[in-house]
């Protein structure tokens, strides 16, 4: 029960999001501030079709809609943190606060674009929440660790390599 009086933090990814593609408002009614949605671009478009349309539209009148704008609008509508996955992962809370975690330039990790890596990210977010971080902070920490593990492993990465590399990342941080 997502809306229970003392509902725990809940991370929704993949099929948990796709299950509501025909009725996203039903999902939004059940969410609370302790929830996190972790869609990739396709899942985002199914949950927030109007926002995705604006995001993908050319800027013919006025300024373009950025991934930051779109993620903020989605978080406000859903009433919870939204982590929009991509090479520039955007994390937004319903209050409008936002962070971006890039996996390009000096933190390039293009090999993260592999099947299952988003599932690992959702697991990392869940683990961070279990350790007591709030939803936005858990999403931010998990996104950073996700990229660091991928960078440490390097090319040829498959999703299963990410959790196996995490102890090295944490040791390097002194954790």
Predicted regions and their residues:
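Feature representing long, continuous alpha-helical segments
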Residues: 69, 122-123, 136, 164
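Charged C-terminal helix
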Residues: 147-175
């Amino acid at each position: 029960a997502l809306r229970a009086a003392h509902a725990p933090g809940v991370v929704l990814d993949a099929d948990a999001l796709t299950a509501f593609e025909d009725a996203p408002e039903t999902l939004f009614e059940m969410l609370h501030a302790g929830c996190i949605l972790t869609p990739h671009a396709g899942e985002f478009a199914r949950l927030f079709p109007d926002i995705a349309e604006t995001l993908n539209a050319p800027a013919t009148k006025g300024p373009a809609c950025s991934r930051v704008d779109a993620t903020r609008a989605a978080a406000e509508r859903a009433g919870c943190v939204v982590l929009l996955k991509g090479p520039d992962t955007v994390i937004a809370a319903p209050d409008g606060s936002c962070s971006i975690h890039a996996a390009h330039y000096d933190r390039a990790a293009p090999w993260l674009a592999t099947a299952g890596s988003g599932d690992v990210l959702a697991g990392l977010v869940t683990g961070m929440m279990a350790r007591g971080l709030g939803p936005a902070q858990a999403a931010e920490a998990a996104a950073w660790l996700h990229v660091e593990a991928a960078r440490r492993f390097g090319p040829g990465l498959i999703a299963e390599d990410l959790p196996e590399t995490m102890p090295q990342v944490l040791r390097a941080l002194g954790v």
